[in-house]
Amino acid sequence: PFPDQNIKGGEIEVIGYRGMKEYDIAFEGYEVPSAHLLGQKEGQGFRQLMSTFESARIQTAARALGVSQNACDLALKYSQERVQFGKELINFSRISEKIAAMFAETMIARQLTLYAARIKDTGQRCDMEAGMSKLLAARTAWASADSALQVHGGIGFASETPISRILADSRILSIFEGTAEIQAQVIAKRLFESNNR
C-alpha cells in the first residue's frame, strides 16, 4: 500500500532482475509537502537528480560486470564438466575460443569501469567515462550471458538453470540508468565538445 490515497499503482511483473521490485506509480491530486521537497529548493530537484547519474552509471557498470563474470564462470565450469564425443567441451576449439573471448571482454569492461570510478573519486567530471563504462559493461554482460547459454546448449534454455536467469537479468542493464542509445549520445556529445576546444 502507498502512504497516501492519491498515489496509485501496482507491482509490475518483470522477466529478470527479480531481486528488486518494479512499480507503476501515478500521482493523482497529490501534493508534496514542502518538508519532502527534493533538492531543498523548488526547481533544484531535477538538477540534483541528474548529478547522481555519473555514480549510478558506474554502479550499473559494476553490476553488469558481476553478471558477466558469473556467466563466464558458469560457462567455464560447465565446459570442464560436460563430456561430448569422449572429451570435455573445453577441449573443442570453438568452445574454448568463445570462453576466452568472454573473459577478455569482461576484463576490458572491468578496466574501463575502474578507470571511470577513479576519475569520479577525484571529483572530476566523468559523464563520458561513466557512460562508456555502462555502455560497454552492459553489452558485455548480455554477450557473455548469450555465449554462456550457447556453451550450455539446450539445457541452458531451461528455466531452472542459473544461466537462464543470468540471461534474463543481463538484458535490463542496457536500459536502466540511461539506455544504451542515451549513453551513446552522451559519449558523442562529450567527444564533440572535447574535439572542438
Regions found by a protein language model. Give the residues of each.
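Glycine-rich phosphate/cofactor-binding loops in nucleotide/flavin-utilizing enzymes
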Residues: 152-197
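Hydrophobic alpha-helical segments of membrane proteins
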Residues: 140-148
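FAD-binding core of flavoproteins
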Residues: 1-73, 77, 87, 179-197
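Amphipathic alpha-helical coiled-coil segments
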Residues: 90-98
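C-terminal helix-coil-helix/basic helical segment that borders enzyme active sites and/or dimer interfaces
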Residues: 76-90, 103-136, 149-154
